[in-house]
């Protein structure tokens, strides 16, 4: 598993969901976690630097998760940062759109700690983290 000091940004407009993901990450040994409530908030934090991984919801106000993902992939400084989409959008076309936009992984809500751990593990393995 990756460096436990890796800094995560959890992006979701629903504070309860952010807390759930934060707690699951903590269970996996990742305590360096910050939160953002939408894509605009997330971008401001990401541009300030220091993050190594983004876990983002899809449906959010101001800037949705797919737009955030595309913006991250278009930014030279952040383009290689892993982005895991965690969303209620289970439709095949959503999963394809996220993959085409460069998502590192995709988890459909609701999910278990084991599912999150498995997805993170696959991303870390693929990136050699």
Swiss-Prot record:
Signal peptide (residue range): none
GO cellular component terms, A-Z: cytoplasm
GO annotation, biological process: archaeal or bacterial-type flagellum-dependent cell motility; chemotaxis; phosphorelay signal transduction system
Keywords: Acetylation, Chemotaxis, Cytoplasm, Flagellar rotation, Magnesium, Metal-binding, Phosphoprotein, Two-component regulatory system
Domain Response regulatory: 7-124
Sites where the protein binds Mg(2+): 12-13, 57, 59
Name of the molecule in the record: Chemotaxis protein CheY
């Amino acid at each position: 598993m990756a460096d436990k000091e890796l800094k995560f940004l959890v992006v979701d407009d629903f504070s309860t969901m952010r807390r759930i993901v934060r707690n699951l990450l903590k269970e996996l040994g990742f305590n360096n976690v910050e939160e953002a409530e939408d894509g605009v908030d997330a971008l401001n934090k990401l541009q300030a630097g220091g993050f190594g991984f983004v876990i983002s919801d899809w449906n959010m106000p101001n800037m949705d998760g797919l737009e955030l993902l595309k913006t991250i992939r278009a930014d030279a400084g952040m383009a290689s940062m892993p982005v895991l989409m965690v969303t209620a959008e289970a439709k095949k076309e959503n999963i394809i759109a996220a993959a085409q936009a460069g998502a590192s992984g995709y988890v459909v809500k609701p999910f278990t700690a084991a599912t999150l751990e498995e997805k993170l593990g696959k991303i870390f393995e693929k990136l050699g983290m």
